[in-house]
Amino acid sequence: MWTSINQALNIIDNFVWGVPLMVLIIAGGLLLTIRLGLLQIRKLPLALKWMLQNEEGGKGEISSFSALCTALSATIGTGNIVGVATAVCAGGPGALFWMVVAAFLGMATKYSEGLLAVKYRTVAEDGHSLGGPFYYIELGMGKNFKWLAKIFAFFGVCVGLFGIGTFSQVNGISSAVHGFFDPNDAFTVKILPFLGEYSWSVVIASLILSFCVAAVLIGGVKRIASVSQIIVPFMAVIYFVFAVILICCNITKVPAAFATIVTAAFSPKAIPGGAVGSMLIAMQKGVARGIFSNEAGLGSAPIAAAAAQTNSPVRQGLVSMTGTFIDTIIICTLTGLSIVLTGAWQVEGLEGVQVTTYAFQHGLPFPAQFSSFILMLCLVFFAFTTILGWDYYSERCLEYLSGGNMKHVKIFRWIYILAVFIGPYMTVSAVWTIADIFNGLMAIPNMIALFALSGVIVKETRAFFQHAKEEALAEHRSFEEVCEENLNEEEAPAN
C-alpha cells in the first residue's frame, strides 16, 4: 500500500517542486538581495546584536528574542538532522551547496517577511497581535487579493497538520527513539489492523509526545515562547558543539569534502551510479529541504514576528533574518558536512535519521551508543519545539480563515494533537514528500506577495537607515547608537 502511495506522492512532488517554483523562490531571494544591497551581509552583525536585545515600550505580546525563538523552534527541527540527510541521499552532496545558496538568498527573503509582518499587523478584539502573509497580502496588495491570502492560510493549516508541524517531526522522533531503545524490534505492538506491528518504543514515544504537546499548547503563544526560549538555544549549542567536534576529528578530510560538495552541485551525476542524479535534482532537493529547514519564503516566520514587542518593522526584519543564518548556514551545514565527511550518505540501506546517526557514531571519538543518545536527545527536543511552533502558525492561519472564530481554533488544537499521535506510523519517504508538497503550495502565494511588495520593503529599509545615517553625522554619534535610539521613538504605522 505504501509503495503505491509513495509513487503517487512523488509524481505530485515533482510537479509542485518543478523548475517554476524553484525559479520563483531563488529569483525572489535574488531580487530582494540586489534591491536591498546585500543587506544580509552588511547588516548581519547589527542583526545578531539586536537579536539578543529587547526593545523597551514596543507594541506586541512577546519580546523580539522570544519571537525569534518561537520562529526558530518551528525551523530548527528534523529538517536540520533528518532533512539534510534525505536531501544528500536523494540529490547527492551537491544538494548541500544549493541548500546554502538558497539560505543566503533566503536571509533577504526572511528579512522582508519580518518587516512586512510588523508593518501590516493588526490587533484582535482580545488584544493579541495578528500578522503574517495573509495580512500583508490583504492590506498591502489590497482587498482584491484576499483570495490569495486565504489560499496561503489554507495551505498553512495543511503544512501544520500534515507536513512540517506534525508527521515529519514525530516520525523523526520515533525513528530516533526506536533506533536507540529497540533497534531489532524485540517487542512489537499492533495498534490497528491496517497499520501492522510497531515497536513498543514507537508507541510509547507517540503517547508521551502527544501528552507533552497537549500540556504546552493549552498555554498559548506565551507558553510556547517561554518553552522555546529555554530549549532552543540550549539544544542548538549542544548540537553545534558535537558537530564541531566531529568535524575537528576529521579535519584532514574537510578540503576533499568541500570539493565533493561543490563539484557534485554542478555534476550531471551527483548521485553514485545513477544518470538520474543531476544538477537539477541536487538543486531541487537542496532548495526544497532548505525551505523545509529555514522556512525562508514559506511565510511561517512572519506569523511569529508579528507578535514581537517592537515598533520598528526594520528591526524585526533583521532579527528574523538571523533565524535563517543560524538554522541553515550554521546548523544544516554542520550536519551536511558531517554526513559527507563520514561517507554516511553512501551506506546502502540507511534512510532519514539513520544516516545522521551513522555519521555521529563513526565520526565522533565517543562510544557509538553515547553518540546515538546525543543525537536522539537533540532530535527529540528540536522536533518537539517545532511541533509547538507550528501549532501556533496553524492556529493563526485558521483564525484568519474562520474570521476570528476561536471555537474552531480550539477544536483544531485537539485535531493537531491527534496528528502528533498518528505521525510515527507512516513511512519516512511518504512523510517527507507530503511535507515538501504542502511547503511548495504554501510558498507560492507568499512569494507572489514579496515580489509585489518589494518596493515597500526597499522604501521602509532605506528610510530607516538613511535617517539614522544623517542623524549620526549631524550629532557625531555612532550609526548603531542612533539606530537603537530610533527604535524606541519609532511608531508602527497605523493600518
Residue ranges of each PLM-predicted region?
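Membrane-interface loop-to-helix entry segments
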Residues: 24-31, 39-48, 170-177, 200-250, ...
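Extracellular/periplasmic helix-exit of transmembrane alpha-helices
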Residues: 33, 113-120, 125, 242-260, ...
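N-terminal alpha-helical transmembrane segments of multi-pass membrane transport
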Residues: 1-78, 88-95, 106, 248, ...
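Alpha-helical membrane segments and immediately flanking helix-loop junctions
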Residues: 57-90, 116-140, 151-154, 158, ...
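Flexible loop linkers connecting adjacent transmembrane helices
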Residues: 38-64, 86-88, 92-96, 108-144, ...
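Helix-loop-helix module between adjacent transmembrane segments
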Residues: 28-33, 73, 102-127, 134, ...
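Extracellular loop-to-transmembrane helix junctions
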Residues: 10-46, 89-128, 148, 327-334, ...
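Transmembrane helix-loop junctions in multi-pass membrane proteins
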Residues: 4-5, 36-40, 79-84, 160-173, ...
